[in-house]
């Protein structure tokens, strides 16, 4: 979807994640980035910024996510949950046999139970901190709560990621995607303790953040830069605003976005045009620096902030600190109470 079809960062309440008579699942749905900003900001620039690589990593990410979802459904084995079905209804799409979906009362996104997701590597504070299962910070971004969740995320990944990979190559975009996903998981774990989390929204917001910083650091080589900036800011603000609705985890979005934003300054700076054209210049022409001074400064500042941010956040997380104790207003990033809904148990 555009804004509404955005990335689903699914969060299920810890107290409801059991199966059978232990109660139902409650989903947190977060938005995937809007397909208007799907292409890189270079779309607004000159032809000299055209694609240079063939995209293969992003399609592989899509295949991997689909494969993991199929494995999750196989492990889930909905027809085997007899007690749960007696209380909540029957499996959906029974013709799929073992791969059929949980009853809609359990999971309205057409997917496995939260118990299965937890078993396969969903993000949960107690397991990450108390049981030292830090690998969940990475594995959770490959799991999806259902077909709707998976489809929205993969559609966003294809629209955003392929164009970026064509312009900057698989190494840089792969690093941004994975580190942004981890950054989103870390921030989410710092502020949310009563839910499990799956989904790639942190990684996808990281790609959006890198698009914005790439525009800033390469500002002088773009045409129509104001149009590009306004479009990106509009898309980003709309997506982040949706995150303040109930059952939407905005912390993963913000953490992924900030990580990707800093990585964009580090990995996506482009050489000046005069440097690229140096071979065609007359002999004896003084060589220009490959990058402008402000690009070097942004690179250094972003690298320091990124390393410091990860070190501080990980130390706080594994020491068991609660981010809400250090930021009294940050809970509003997760949900803003109104006359139409409450945020007490969100």
Swiss-Prot record:
Database matches in InterPro entries: Peptidase_S54_rhomboid-like (IPR002610), Peptidase_S54_rhomboid_dom (IPR022764), Rhomboid-like_sf (IPR035952)
Membrane topology: Multi-pass membrane protein
Residue positions of the active site: 201 (nucleophile), 253 (charge relay system)
Compartments (UniProt record): Golgi apparatus membrane
Enzyme nomenclature, EC number: 3.4.21.105
Purpose: Probable rhomboid-type serine protease that catalyzes intramembrane proteolysis.
Name of this protein: RHOMBOID-like protein 3
């Amino acid at each position: 979807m555009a804004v509404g079809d955005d990335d689903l960062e699914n969060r299920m309440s810890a107290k409801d994640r059991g199966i059978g008579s232990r109660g139902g699942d409650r989903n947190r749905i977060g938005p995937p980035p809007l397909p208007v900003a799907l292409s890189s900001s270079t779309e607004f620039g000159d032809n000299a910024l055209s694609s240079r690589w063939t995209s293969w990593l992003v399609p592989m990410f899509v295949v991997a996510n689909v494969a993991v979802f199929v494995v999750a459904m196989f492990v889930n084995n909905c027809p085997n949950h007899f007690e749960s079905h007696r209380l909540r209804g029957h499996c959906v799409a029974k013709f799929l046999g073992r791969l059929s979906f949980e009853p809609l009362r359990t999971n309205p996104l057409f997917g496995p139970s939260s118990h299965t997701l937890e078993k396969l590597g969903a993000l949960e504070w107690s397991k990450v901190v108390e049981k030292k299962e830090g690998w969940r910070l990475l594995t959770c971004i490959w799991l999806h709560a259902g077909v709707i969740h998976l489809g929205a995320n993969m559609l966003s990944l294809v629209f955003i990621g392929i164009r970026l990979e064509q312009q900057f190559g698989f190494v840089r975009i792969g690093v941004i995607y994975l580190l942004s996903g981890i950054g989103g998981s870390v921030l989410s774990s710092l502020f949310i303790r009563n839910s499990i989390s799956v989904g790639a929204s942190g990684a996808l917001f990281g790609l959006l953040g890198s698009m914005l910083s790439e525009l800033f650091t390469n500002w002088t080589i773009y045409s129509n830069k104001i149009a590009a900036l306004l479009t990106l800011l509009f898309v980003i603000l709309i997506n982040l605003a949706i995150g303040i609705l109930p059952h939407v985890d905005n912390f993963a979005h913000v953490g992924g976005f900030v990580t990707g934003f800093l990585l964009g300054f580090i990995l996506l700076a482009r050489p000046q045009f005069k440097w690229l054209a140096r071979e065609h210049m007359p002999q004896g022409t003084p060589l220009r620096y490959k990058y402008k001074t402000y690009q070097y400064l942004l690179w250094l500042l972003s690298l320091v902030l990124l390393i410091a941010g990860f070190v501080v956040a990980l130390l706080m997380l594994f020491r068991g600190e609660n981010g809400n104790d250090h930021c009294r207003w940050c809970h509003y990033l997760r949900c803003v109470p109104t006359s139409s809904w409450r945020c007490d148990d969100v």
